[in-house]
Amino acid sequence: TLFPYTTLFRSAVLIKKAADESQRELDKSEIYNLFVKHWLEAKGNLSIVDLAETHLEGKENSESTSCRAVVEWKGKRYSIGKTGNGPLDAFAGALSEIPAPKFRITAFHEHSIGTGNDTSAVAYVQITCEDGNQYWGAGKSTNVGRAGVDAVVSALNQIK
């Protein structure tokens, strides 16, 4: 499926609204374009300016990834960095250094699109904020780790 089950209702509302406004059924490309606009290109308070990930080697760090990033939150730039058990965990941890809502990742789903060298990963994350509100985001990239990172940005950009 294109969406994890828990995002289907939210997506159905968006699709129904667009169909009602156009007074006709939407075709597949129009539905996909809504997905891209609302989830993959969600504009909001957070954007990535620069991102670097390093897989750490050695006995103690063999499963660790270091993330260094420059992000913009509400128009202000921050240099952030953390180490985690992978790119997604490291990036999510680094975001604790900015004044964004504190959250934890409570669901993650990923699948591939395409075959061979043209394969992309689409990642979906659900975040749960300290206030209990949950938000879904989606990211797409040829880099599996980056798809997850972009999904976190998308989820945070769902917060209004």
Walk through the language-model features, giving the residues of each.
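Terminal or standalone catalytic/regulatory effector modules within metabolic enzymes
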Residues: L2, T6-K160
